[in-house]
């Protein structure tokens, strides 16, 4: 007599789906399935016990959850598509917040709303082609600058560095960026100065440097007066008074990714003495 096996709450990778709150800040692998809080059983995921009867099951509210990089919505679960640490940002209002996978990758995938540093590689008609480190260049209109009109065109040349924001980023269209905010103001965006040094770091280091609790930039500002621009595409532009100070700042920023807090304090103390 043939035995019928039930599939149960198993993930694509063959392992049991886990509750999303139990794996926060832990390493997740591609193929794992994560169950959102509003879909968990009282007994645990896939428990063998009987589930309690819910009289208001039909009126149960669904949490609004935003899937960031490395995650994909699969029914009532989240499917992991990248290896890394699972992160969560609490919502400002109602909802379940934002979940994403923090991975150590160098290849940038454009995301809507990201502020990036690009390099103008071509000019065709009224459109600039800007290299942002993705699979294809982004398009930038000459009208996407503060105060730009058909008569008053911005002075942008091939090879210039552009700091702007991605406004279109999906798999079916080429990326599009602008150098103005929603009010039409530059707000720090536009062509970056000719002097300074541009170098590339990992995307994880960029997120670390831009975190609210990161003190690295403040500590660097105490060493030398500097100008610095961070791009979410892994590019950093820095400028100090002298070339030597600029190179020191770039080397320290690159090394901070693999330093502990104590090692970083020792390096800053040595630089302050010299």
Swiss-Prot record:
It is found in: Cytoplasm; Nucleus, Nucleolus; Nucleus. The modification N-acetylalanine is found at residue 2. GO terms for molecular function: exonuclease activity; RNA binding. Disulfide bonds: none annotated. There is a cross-link at residue 150 (Glycyl lysine isopeptide (Lys-Gly) (interchain with G-Cter in SUMO2)). Keywords: Acetylation, Cytoplasm, Exonuclease, Exosome, Hydrolase, Isopeptide bond, Nuclease, Nucleus, RNA-binding, rRNA processing, Ubl conjugation. The keyword Protein biosynthesis does not apply. Its EC number is 3.1.13.-. InterPro entries: Exosome_RNA_bind1/RRP40/RRP4 (IPR026699), KH_dom_type_1 (IPR004088), KH_dom_type_1_sf (IPR036612), NA-bd_OB-fold (IPR012340), RRP40_KH-I (IPR049469), RRP40_N (IPR048541), Rrp40_S1 (IPR037319). One of its GO terms (biological process) is positive regulation of isotype switching. CDD domains: KH-I_Rrp40 (cd22526), S1_Rrp40 (cd05790). GO terms for cellular component: cytoplasmic exosome (RNase complex); cytosol; euchromatin; exosome (RNase complex); nuclear exosome (RNase complex); nucleolar exosome (RNase complex); nucleolus; nucleoplasm. It comes from the Eukaryota. Component of the RNA exosome core complex (Exo-9), composed of EXOSC1, EXOSC2, EXOSC3, EXOSC4, EXOSC5, EXOSC6, EXOSC7, EXOSC8 and EXOSC9; within the complex interacts with EXOSC5 and EXOSC9. The catalytically inactive RNA exosome core complex (Exo-9) associates with the catalytic subunit EXOSC10/RRP6. Exo-9 may associate with DIS3 to form the nucleolar exosome complex, or DIS3L to form the cytoplasmic exosome complex. Exo-9 is formed by a hexameric base ring consisting of the heterodimers EXOSC4-EXOSC9, EXOSC5-EXOSC8 and EXOSC6-EXOSC7, and a cap ring consisting of EXOSC1, EXOSC2 and EXOSC3. Non-catalytic component of the RNA exosome complex which has 3'->5' exoribonuclease activity and participates in a multitude of cellular RNA processing and degradation events. In the nucleus, the RNA exosome complex is involved in proper maturation of stable RNA species such as rRNA, snRNA and snoRNA, in the elimination of RNA processing by-products and non-coding 'pervasive' transcripts, such as antisense RNA species and promoter-upstream transcripts (PROMPTs), and of mRNAs with processing defects, thereby limiting or excluding their export to the cytoplasm. Belongs to the RRP40 family. PANTHER family: EXOSOME COMPLEX COMPONENT RRP40 (PTHR21321:SF1), PNAS-3 RELATED (PTHR21321). This is Exosome complex component RRP40. It comes from Mus musculus. The gene is Exosc3.
């Amino acid at each position: 007599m043939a035995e019928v096996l039930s599939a149960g709450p198993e993930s694509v990778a063959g392992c049991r789906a886990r509750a999303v709150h139990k794996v926060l800040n832990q390493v997740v692998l591609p193929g794992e399935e994560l169950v959102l809080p509003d879909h968990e059983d009282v007994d645990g995921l896939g428990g063998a016990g009987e589930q309690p009867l819910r009289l208001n099951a039909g009126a149960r509210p669904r949490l609004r959850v935003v899937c960031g990089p490395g995650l994909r919505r699969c029914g009532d679960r989240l499917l992991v598509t990248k290896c890394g640490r699972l992160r969560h940002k609490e919502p400002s209002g109602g909802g379940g917040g934002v979940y994403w996978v923090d991975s150590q990758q160098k290849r940038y995938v454009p995301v809507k709303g990201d502020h990036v540093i690009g390099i103008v590689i071509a000019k065709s008609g009224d459109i600039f082609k800007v290299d942002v480190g993705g699979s294809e260049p982004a398009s930038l209109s000459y009208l996407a600058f503060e105060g730009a009109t058909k008569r008053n065109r911005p002075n942008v040349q091939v090879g210039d560095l552009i700091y702007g924001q991605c406004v279109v980023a999906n798999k079916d269209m080429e990326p599009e960026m602008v150098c103005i905010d929603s009010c039409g103001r530059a707000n720090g965006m536009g062509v970056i100065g000719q002097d300074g040094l541009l170098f590339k770091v990992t995307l994880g280091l960029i997120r670390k440097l831009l975190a609210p609790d990161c003190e690295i930039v403040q500590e660097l500002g105490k060493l030398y007066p500097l100008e610095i621009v961070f791009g979410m595409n892994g590019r950093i532009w820095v400028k100090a008074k002298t070339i030597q100070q600029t190179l020191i700042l770039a080397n320290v920023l690159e090394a901070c990714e693999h330093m502990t807090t104590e090692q970083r304090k020792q390096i800053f103390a040595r630089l302050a003495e010299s």
